[in-house]
């Protein structure tokens, strides 16, 4: 029996290593790998990219674009984990749960662009509310997120974990202070916002896991929209989703904190709606593993859909 061949271009980076670990013991796919001395050889990479059934690109943006250019075999399908193609109209956005029928779009796609980690949480919260008309498209969205330092890739991991670091890393590093984070166009486009959201990301002094929050002022929403309606919309949208759950309102009301590491090691996304009707304020939250649903887990979920596993969504 012939099994689909998967080539991970960039399998030594943070995301590539995680995807390889998720696939190496599976018996339904065959991993095509290059010897260490050939991993950066353009000719050998091109050979592998054209010999596989599905190529998974775990590369910097420029290298990912180059890799796509190497592909001449029309049968090769691609999952790109970089941000190079996330707003390109000829690539299918790899968030199966974001819209009805979207898992099938991924299943039949030739080119799939894996979502960014922060956009996964932001789009997961915003898109259903915008589609339902509960949140105006021109709402001034503000997004705050803290990720484990692995979200910064190998350089950040080395900086936080190196015993030889001259200066100990800060417990919290707010970054993107120029307000030009590369995830902003992706969030705006796939959430369906009319304007750029205000996005403030940070790295915490822990390895992995994200907590992302979006404050909502009910007075700026259409008349009659309440926190309960926002929650009901999200709960209905994700009712059949295998990897997305919405915390019941009563559980959210009883919560005292959000743990960014709560879903580490999973491919799950947990959404929450915290309501203070008396103040007219709501806090939307998303908790997930930046290396799971925010990266490698999402890539493998998309791979499974492309291989015909409808249960992946």
From Swiss-Prot:
Q: Which domain of life is it from?
A: Bacteria
Q: Which Gene3D superfamilies match?
A: Dihydrodipicolinate Reductase, domain 2, NAD(P)-binding Rossmann-like Domain
Q: State the top-level EC class.
A: oxidoreductase
- What pathway does this protein act in? Amino-acid biosynthesis; L-arginine biosynthesis; N(2)-acetyl-L-ornithine from L-glutamate: step 3/4
Q: Where in the cell is it found?
A: Cytoplasm
Major site of localization recorded for this protein: cytoplasm
What cellular-component terms does GO give this entry?
cytoplasm
Chemical reaction(s) catalysed: N-acetyl-L-glutamate 5-semialdehyde + phosphate + NADP(+) = N-acetyl-L-glutamyl 5-phosphate + NADPH + H(+)
Please provide the record's keywords in A-Z order. Amino-acid biosynthesis, Arginine biosynthesis, Cytoplasm, NADP, Oxidoreductase
Task: List the cysteine pairs that form cystine.
Answer: none
Q: Which catalytic residues are annotated?
A: 117
Enzyme Commission number, as recorded:
1.2.1.38
GO MF terms, alphabetically ordered:
N-acetyl-gamma-glutamyl-phosphate reductase activity; NAD binding
Mind telling me which SUPFAM superfamilies this protein's record contains? Glyceraldehyde-3-phosphate dehydrogenase-like, C-terminal domain, NAD(P)-binding Rossmann-fold domains
What does this chain do?
Catalyzes the NADPH-dependent reduction of N-acetyl-5-glutamyl phosphate to yield N-acetyl-L-glutamate 5-semialdehyde.
Protein family membership: Belongs to the NAGSA dehydrogenase family. Type 2 subfamily.
Q: Which PANTHER family match?
A: N-ACETYL-GAMMA-GLUTAMYL-PHOSPHATE REDUCTASE, CHLOROPLASTIC-RELATED (PTHR32338:SF10), N-ACETYL-GAMMA-GLUTAMYL-PHOSPHATE REDUCTASE, CHLOROPLASTIC-RELATED-RELATED (PTHR32338)
Known NCBIfam families for this protein? Answer: argC_other
Q: What is this protein called?
A: N-acetyl-gamma-glutamyl-phosphate reductase
